[in-house]
Amino acid sequence: DEMKKVTDVLMRHPQVHVLTDDIYEHLVYGDFKFVTPAQVEPNLIDRTLTMNGVSKAYAMTGWRIGYCAGPLPLIEAMTNIQSQSTSNPTSISQVAAETGLNGDQGFIREMVKAFIARQLKG
C-alpha cells in the first residue's frame, strides 16, 4: 500500500528517475513483504535503477560484491565509470557471491530469526 502511493506520485512525474537500494531485501521482519517500485508499477521499469549486493543477507560485508539492473544506456555509462575508478573484487569473492545468490536461501530466515531475538532482548 505504501509503495503504491509512492509509485502513483512517480507516475505523475515522468521526469523523475528511481534509484533503489535493495541490499536488505531478504532481511525483513514479520509479515512485511519486500517489493520494488517497478514490481508495483511496471511502467517504472524504464526509469528505475536497482542496486543490490551480497554484504547483508549473505554475510559478505567488506567483500565489495554488488550489482545493478536498469536501463541499458545507464548501465553502460556506469560500467565505463566503474571500470576506470575501482578495481575488480577477488575471484574467490565472486565465486562465493555467486554461490550465495544461487544456493539454498533457507539460512537467511534463520539469520532474520536471530536478529529478531536480539531485538527482543534489547
For the regions a protein language model found, what residue spans apply to each?
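Conserved core segment of the aminotransferase class I/II
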Residues: 41-116, 120
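Active-site pre-lysine segment of PLP-dependent enzymes
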Residues: 1-15, 24-60, 72-73
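Glycine-centered flexible beta-alpha turn that most often forms the glycine-rich phosphate-binding loop
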Residues: 21
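Alpha-helix capping/termination and helix-coil
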Residues: 27, 119-122
